Amino acid sequence: MHYARTFETRGAYQFGSVNRVMLHASGPWAGGTVGLHVMGSAELLTLGARGAPQLLQVAFHADGGTVTDHVHPSPWLMELAGSYDAVLSEDLSISLYAAAIGEPALGPPVYLHRGSAAANPVVPLAHHLQDDTHSSYGVVTYGMRWPGLDLEVSAFNDRQPEEVGPVFFYDGARLDATAGRATIHAGKEWKVFGTYGYTPATTGGHAHDAQHRLGLGALHDAEPWSLSVIYGANNPVGAEGPRHSVLAEAQWNSPTGDALFTRVEYVQRTADELALVGSISAIQDIESMQIGYSRAVAVRGKVMGRLGGYVTVNLTPPQLTPFYGTSVPFGTAVYGEVTLVGRSVR
């Protein structure tokens, strides 16, 4: 459960719950390992269709209107997928991933699965420039792994419903978006990745022109620290150039389960994404800084209870000041969290 509050002209407040349940099962089959992956959420009930307050997040449709400065709720089902992994030789293994709803090989690991954001309940502002394809309605991915190198290619459907709500959405579905990702394992603690994808023009939720997406990043995981530095850009076909984003986030974990987390972002927003079309320049440069702390207050077996909070401070250009009432709009939240077997419900 959380109490979230954003301030100034576009501020809002909410009592609600950010929550997710992830289930994974695996077993031997046909000389390899077959897996089932399911992830769901009840945020449409616990947050409502308008989601949670978050300044400068991408506007979306809900209840027949446009919602600004909120993050949309997660859909009922975010992943329903099967996988197959097999070792072909001492130096080569392969994988096949097929999903009715799932994540293609585009961008970094989605923020939900990064160690550097494990205790952070906030969706990055750069989400729509880096990893927003994580719940695509139709994905097929083939991967090959050598010591120190992973290569993956995906075909997927990038169309989304007009509003969050349908469990499945396949109107006009085609696997006509493509993506590839290369990941270098620099020792046991560092991963460096590069990614490219092409998505055709879509309507509905997350509507966009045909575009290319580029991404680069490095991830470090070694207790007590996890760190991610990520660059992502969308380059619409026919545009003057790409829109850029840079994210750096880190988390420190104490031996008792406490966590200190932080995130710094630079994002280029379009006027359309802020629902301010015609009144400001087409592209706006935004910076955001966040710091938070999560304290373990109870541990019983594999269940851990936490209390946490965070503060987010944003820096906006002068053209946005009349709409936000300040050049430094900010927000804060306090929350209680229950974690079960390494997964969390907030």
Language-model regions: role of each:
Residues 1-5, 36-42, 96-100, 155-157, ...:
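Transmembrane beta-barrel strands of outer-membrane/channel proteins
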Residues 1-83, 87, 331-333, 337-339:
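Beta-barrel outer-membrane channel/assembly domains of diderm bacteria
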Residues 6, 48-183:
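Surface-exposed coil loops of outer-membrane beta-barrel proteins
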Residues 14-21, 74-80, 134-140, 145-147, ...:
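Residues that define the transmembrane beta-barrel architecture of outer-membrane proteins
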Residues 25-29, 84-86, 143-146, 184-186, ...:
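Residue-level signature of outer-membrane beta-barrel architecture
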Residues 30-36, 90-94, 104, 144, ...:
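Repeated loop/turn-to-beta-strand initiation elements of outer-membrane beta-barrel proteins
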Residues 146, 150, 154, 173, ...:
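Detector for outer-membrane/organellar transmembrane beta-barrel domains
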Residues 291, 326-346:
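Outer-membrane beta-barrel "beta-signal"
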